[in-house]
């Protein structure tokens, strides 16, 4: 093979690589945010939750579910879901977590669950802050709110939790940053300079002083367990973990998990 042919092959491979980089750069948000994926448990809602709409600062009405506990409590669980699927796919969590003396607000992000808009990092932060304001308008104080983040929702949880003293924080399958997560899935791409939405959770979690529970499956093939462990190590006390080896990406809501949740809720004194 002569030198000119070698150069042509190299040039062709480089062109293909650059096309891949360009494609991923242009499509990155459609690869990250997956509102139409239906890959979670299918379960009917067993509590009387109300369909509500929370308006964010971009005047988008966010479809949400609000369960008001019959005990007339101020304790409220605010849930931020992950990057895939509608709020219906989280009904099983509401069914389980309604056992505690708390209200539950589960919001859906812009473009999810039939909402308008396009998801971005700043957009999701705005959606979360709008949900907090909605609760405050119902005379529910920050100190009575427990933030629950699932996967992508953990990054949003950490962003808002570093700026206020919430009653508690629950993180399910947290990642250190979107840069690290993207490197795991696309090790051949320069994701550090490509990503628009970086979600730098590892730089923010040290600013949280609320009690925190981190749950992560050791067999997670989407967000590696090492990221959850790193986030736990970076978190301030008081902190607790539920690390389980049987599950994949999201932890199973079984007796073992609920026992750990019971212990965390005792720390938060929710049922008193």
Task: Provide a role label for each language-model segment.
Residues 93, 201, 210, 224-233:
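Short alpha-helix in the alpha/beta-hydrolase fold that links the catalytic acid
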Residues 9-55:
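An N-terminal hydrophobic leader/cap segment in hydrolases
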Residues 230-233, 237-272:
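C-terminal catalytic histidine-bearing segment of alpha/beta-hydrolase fold enzymes
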Residues 219-223, 249-251:
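Acidic catalytic loop of the alpha/beta-hydrolase fold
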Residues 207-209, 214-220:
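Short beta-strand/loop motif that positions the catalytic acidic residue
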Residues 57-134, 150, 154-155, 161:
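Membrane-embedded segments
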Residues 154-210:
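Hydrolase active-site cap/lid region
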Residues 139-151:
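Alpha/beta-hydrolase fold nucleophile elbow
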């Amino acid at each position: 093979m002569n030198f000119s042919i070698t150069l042509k092959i190299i040039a062709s491979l480089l062109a293909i690589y650059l096309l891949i980089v360009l494609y991923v750069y242009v499509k990155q948000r459609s690869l990250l945010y997956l509102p139409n994926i239906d890959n979670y448990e299918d379960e009917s809602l067993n509590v009387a939750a109300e369909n509500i709409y929370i308006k964010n600062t971009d005047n988008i009405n966010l479809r949400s579910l609000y369960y008001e506990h019959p005990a007339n409590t101020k304790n409220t669980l605010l849930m931020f879901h992950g990057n895939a699927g509608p709020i219906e796919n989280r009904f099983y969590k509401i069914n389980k977590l309604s056992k505690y003396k708390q209200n539950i607000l589960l919001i859906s992000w812009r473009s999810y669950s039939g909402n308008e808009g396009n998801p971005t990092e700043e957009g999701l932060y705005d959606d979360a802050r709008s949900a907090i304001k909605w609760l405050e308008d119902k005379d529910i104080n920050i100190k009575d709110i427990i933030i629950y983040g699932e996967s992508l929702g953990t990054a949003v949880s950490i962003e808002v939790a570093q700026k206020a003293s919430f009653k508690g924080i629950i993180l399910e399958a947290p990642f250190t940053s979107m840069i690290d997560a993207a490197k795991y899935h696309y090790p051949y791409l320069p994701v550090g300079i490509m990503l628009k939405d970086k979600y730098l959770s590892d730089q923010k979690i040290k600013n949280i002083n609320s009690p925190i529970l981190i749950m992560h499956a050791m067999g997670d093939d989407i967000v590696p367990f090492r990221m959850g462990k790193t986030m736990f190590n970076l978190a301030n006390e008081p902190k607790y973990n539920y690390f389980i080896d049987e599950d994949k990406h999201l932890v199973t809501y079984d007796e073992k998990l609920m026992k750990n949740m019971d212990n965390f809720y005792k720390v938060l004194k929710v049922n008193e």
